[in-house]
Amino acid sequence: MTRRIWLAAACLTLLVLPIGAQARQYRARLSPVPIDVAMQATIAGSGSVTATLAGNTLTLSGTYKDLRTAATVVRLHRGPRVAMRGPAVADLKATGGTMGTIAGTIELTKEQLDDLSNGRLYVQLHSEKAPDGNLWGWLFPQEGKKQ
């Protein structure tokens, strides 16, 4: 009897693990967001970032192009609400130049997981002439995209 219970528990575990282990996909469209009129002359470009959440590990990768000056810094930020700016929570890597790639892997806290699922995390790319941010993009779930 005990052997059957252990066997049933093992089978149930094998069935449940793949469901919980599915990765969720997120996407951000990077675009310029001028803070004031003076910034309109210094910011330009576009890009996109795809993020995969597996457990509490968020892996980001993306591209950007057509910046007016070279990229300097790219970070993951947390806004207090959707589409509101907030503090940086992690550094990402950019290849530099006026076009390139973005990459990073971050272990998210419970609070950051909640922020991600509620659209409060965003990617911000800075450039030489736009040190306060050149491109922004909020991470939103890709509907139906689980791995």
PLM-predicted stretches and their roles:
Residues M1-A9:
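Bacterial N-terminal signal peptides that target proteins for export
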